[in-house]
C-alpha cells in the first residue's frame, strides 16, 4: 500500500501544467494535483495569457502548491521550456491542462520509483477518455525500454514521464524546431542517446482527454511522424520507415482494442 511506504529521502516533485484558454478542464487538473497523497509537490501553471477565465480559476484555487506564471508564449514547447527553467523540484514532469491523474496515489508511485538512486526517469501507462471522462477509448500500455525501441515506433506516454532535474540540465530542453514531436524527440534523446535509466511503472497514472494537437487531424498525425523520422535521423538512430509505421499501426490498433474491452468491464 502506498500509504505504508516510508520514504528514505523526501523528494520534491515539480508538476508543470501548460495552459491556454483551458477554462472547461483546468479545474480537474488542479484538483488532481491537490488531492495527491504525496505532498512534497510544486505545481507550476505556465499560462499563455488566457482570455477565457482560466486565470481566475487558477488564482482562486485553494492549493498553496500552485505557482502561476501567465504571459504570451511562442507555442506549447516554449511554454514547457519555461516550466523546466522555473522548476525547483528534484523530479520534474508534466500534466496537461485537460488531463488528470488516475487516482490520489500517482505522485507517491512516482516518488517511490525514484527512491532507487539508479533511476533517472520513470514512465507508466495512460488511458484516453472521452471529454466527459465517462469511458475509456484507448489504453496506452507501455513496457520496459529497450535500446532501439524508438526506431520501431515505440514511445512512452509523455504525460507519465518524470525525470530528474539533473538529467534535464545535462541533456537539454525541448527542441522547438519540432512543432508536434518535441516531446518524442526529448524522450528519444534521453533514453536512446543519454543512457538515462528509466523505470517502468505498470499502472495507469494519467487519464487524457481526446483532442490533443497531434490527434486533431490526419494531417497532424502525418506531420508528427515526419518529425519523428527527422528526430531519428538527427539523433543517428537507424530505422526503416515501413517497419516503423507497421509497428505503430499494430500498436495503436491493439491500444484501441484494449480500450474497448476496458470500456465494457
Locate predicted features.
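Short aromatic/hydrophobic "clamp" motif used to bind/position activated sugar donors
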Residues: 92
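Short, acidic, metal-binding catalytic loop of nucleotide-sugar glycosyltransferases
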Residues: 31-40
Amino acid at each position: 500500500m502506498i500509504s505504508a511506504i516510508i520514504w528514505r529521502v523526501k523528494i520534491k516533485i515539480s508538476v508543470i501544467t501548460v495552459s491556454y484558454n483551458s477554462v472547461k478542464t483546468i479545474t480537474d487538473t488542479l484538483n488532481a494535483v491537490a488531492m495527491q497523497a504525496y505532498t512534497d509537490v510544486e505545481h507550476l501553471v505556465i499560462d499563455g495569457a488566457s482570455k477565457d477565465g482560466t486565470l481566475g480559476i487558477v488564482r482562486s484555487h485553494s492549493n498553496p502548491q500552485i505557482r502561476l506564471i501567465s504571459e504570451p508564449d511562442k507555442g506549447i514547447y516554449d511554454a514547457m521550456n519555461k516550466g523546466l527553467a522555473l522548476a525547483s523540484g528534484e523530479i520534474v514532469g508534466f500534466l496537461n491542462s485537460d488531463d488528470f491523474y488516475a487516482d490520489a496515489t500517482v505522485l507517491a508511485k512516482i516518488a517511490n520509483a525514484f527512491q532507487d538512486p539508479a533511476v533517472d526517469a520513470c514512465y507508466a501507462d495512460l488511458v484516453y477518455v472521452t471529454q466527459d471522462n465517462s469511458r475509456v477509448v484507448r489504453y496506452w500500455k507501455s513496457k520496459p525500454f529497450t535500446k532501439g525501441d524508438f526506431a520501431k515506433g515505440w514511445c512512452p506516454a509523455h504525460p507519465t514521464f518524470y525525470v530528474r532535474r539533473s538529467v534535464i540540465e545535462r541533456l537539454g530542453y525541448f527542441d522547438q524546431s519540432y512543432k508536434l514531436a518535441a516531446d518524442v524527440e526529448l524522450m528519444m534523446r534521453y533514453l536512446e542517446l543519454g543512457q538515462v535509466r528509466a523505470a517502468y511503472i505498470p499502472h495507469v497514472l494519467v487519464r487524457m482527454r481526446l483532442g490533443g494537437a497531434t490527434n486533431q487531424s490526419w494531417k497532424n498525425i502525418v506531420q508528427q511522424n515526419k518529425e519523428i523520422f527527422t528526430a531519428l535521423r538527427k539523433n543517428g538512430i537507424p530505422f526503416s520507415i515501413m517497419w516503423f509505421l507497421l509497428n505503430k499501426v499494430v500498436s495503436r490498433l491493439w491500444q484501441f482494442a484494449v480500450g474497448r474491452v476496458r470500456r465494457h468491464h
